[in-house]
Each structure stands twice: as C-alpha cells, then as structure tokens.
UniProtKB/Swiss-Prot annotation:
It comes from Methanocaldococcus jannaschii (strain ATCC 43067 / DSM 2661 / JAL-1 / JCM 10045 / NBRC 100440) (Methanococcus jannaschii). Homooctamer; tetramer of dimers. This is Thiamine thiazole synthase. It catalyses: hydrogen sulfide + glycine + NAD(+) = ADP-5-ethyl-4-methylthiazole-2-carboxylate + nicotinamide + 3 H2O + H(+). Gene3D superfamilies: FAD/NAD(P)-binding domain. Unlike THI4 from S.cerevisiae, Thi4 from M.jannaschii can catalyze multiple turnovers because the sulfide is not enzyme derived. The lineage of its organism: Archaea, Methanobacteriati, Methanobacteriota, Methanomada group, Methanococci. Glycine binds at R240. Binds 1 Fe(2+) ion per subunit. Other divalent metal cations can support activity. GO terms for biological process: thiamine biosynthetic process; thiamine diphosphate biosynthetic process; thiazole biosynthetic process.
Length: 267
C-alpha cells in the first residue's frame, strides 16, 4: 500500500522498452482473442453500446468497433451544445440500470447529462464483457454462402491519410450496423455486391414518427446483418428525431434480443 501522504518521496520505475513491450504483448493477446467473435457491432453510439451490454450479459463474445477515438456517437454535444439529452418513458429504465442520473421534466420526459450517459453506457458494456475498440474503421464485409461472416477492418488514421495498406479481418456470427445516420455497413453491402435493394436514407425530422419507426426498423436486413439505432431508420427511410434518445436505447436492446434468439436457436 502506497502512503499517499508522501507522494513527493515516491520513486517511479519507468522504462521505455518495458512500456513498449507491455503494450505490444497486451495488444497482440487481445487481437488474437477477438479475431473470432460472436457479434461485431460497428459504431459505439447509444444504440450500439446498449446492444453490446445486453449481448455481453448473455455471455456472447462482443466486439464494438468505433472509427473515432471517442465512443458515444452524437450524445456528447447534447442538443446544439447544451449538455443534456432527453429520454422518454419507458426507455428511462435502461439508463437507470447503469446508474445514470435523470431529471424528471414531467409528462414522461427526463433529461440526462450528455457526458455522463455515454461514459456510463460504455463502462457498463465493458463491465458486462464487451470489448470496445476505437480508431478502427470497417471498410468491407466478409461474405459466405449463408450471409455476412465478419468485417474487414483498418486503422482510421490509415484511411484518413489515404495510404494504400491492406486491411485485417474479424470473423463473427453476426454483424450489427450501428453506424448512425450513414448506415455505412448496409450501404457497403448493397453497393459492393450490386444487391437489388434500396437504401433510401433518413427523412427530415419528425420525432414521434422517427422514434416509433426505430422499433419496427430494428431487424435482420440480410442474413447475419442487423441494424439498430439511426442506421435502422436510415436504411428504411425513417424520420430523424433530434436530441431525444429513448428509441435509440430501446432499439439497441431489441437488437440484442433478436440476435440472442437467433444465436441460441443455432446452438
């Protein structure tokens, strides 16, 4: 036990080579463990993190890939920079489960701190067993006869730099497009494989219709490929909702339930 009363007298053992070796060894061990997963979730926003938590709690090996260095999607900035988001009943219960503080605004509306929400959702997903990796972009999908079989990944920094460096892969039983407004994984699948499918993109804002459509649009859109959150609405031409997030969390939970049913039926 370190006596924190004498911090000035502590001598720290810091060696550059040992630091490098420790990071490399831990990283290789981690990558070797996750190159085969049950579920890969692309996008660490509100729906993706929620989906990851519930799947990990079921005992599945879950890997969440986020191209940016920060998880949380569009939650951090709240509404137009004001540091709160809105969640409506009954989705507030999903936030209470992870200890997020809510302020009752009446009429079934609550506000939550826009920094606290993604932080606690991410910690809860990791505590449940999910692995979250940032700075990783999914540039393609692995396909097999029975559908999607994993993701093709690269460093987002490499992509941004425009360097021609070949990617690596993660095999999985299921892939989830939780990329938000872009629905980028669905678009990759359709465009690269010349599928006869329409990805209409999202419509303008109509919060009530958008929120309710989320739960209808959260589904398996191609064998072993699911959509949740705003990617579900974008891939089905649903409306956007703005800074009200209840449907996003419920969509993530519903997606986890659908995947759980699919994977357990395969066993």
């Amino acid at each position: 036990m370190v006596n924190l009363m004498n911090i000035k007298d502590i001598k720290l053992n810091a060696d550059e080579t040992k630091t490098t070796k420790a990071i490399l060894k831990a990283s290789f061990d981690m990558w070797l463990d996750i190159v085969e997963a049950d579920v890969v979730i692309v996008g660490a926003g509100p729906s993706g993190l929620t989906c990851a938590r519930y799947l990990a709690k079921e005992g599945f090996k879950v890997v969440v890939l986020e191209r940016h260095l920060a998880f949380g999607g569009g939650t951090w900035g709240g509404g137009m920079g004001f540091p709160y988001i809105v969640v409506e009943e009954p989705a507030d219960e999903l936030l209470r489960e992870v200890g997020i503080k809510l302020i009752d605004m009446g009429d079934g509306y609550y506000v939550a701190d826009s920094v606290e929400v993604p932080a606690k959702l991410a910690v809860a997903a990791m505590d449940a067993g999910a692995k979250i990796l940032t700075g990783i972009v999914v540039e393609d999908l692995i396909l097999r006869e029975d559908g999607v079989a994993g993701v093709v990944i690269n460093s987002y920094a490499i992509e941004r730099a425009g360097l021609h460096i070949d990617p690596l892969t993660i095999r999985s039983k299921v892939v989830v497009d939780a990329t938000g407004h872009e629905a980028s994984i669905v678009n990759i699948l359709v465009k690269k494989n010349k599928l006869e499918a329409d990805v209409p993109g999202e419509k303008s804002m109509w919060a009530e219709k958008g929120e309710n459509a989320l739960l209808r649009n959260t589904r398996e859109v191609y064998p072993n490929l699911f959509v949740c959150g705003m990617a579900a609405n974008a891939s089905h031409g649903g409306y956007r909702m703005g800074a009200i997030f209840g449907g996003m969390y419920l969509s993530g939970k519903l997606c986890a339930e659908l995947i759980t049913e699919k994977l357990k039926n395969k066993e």
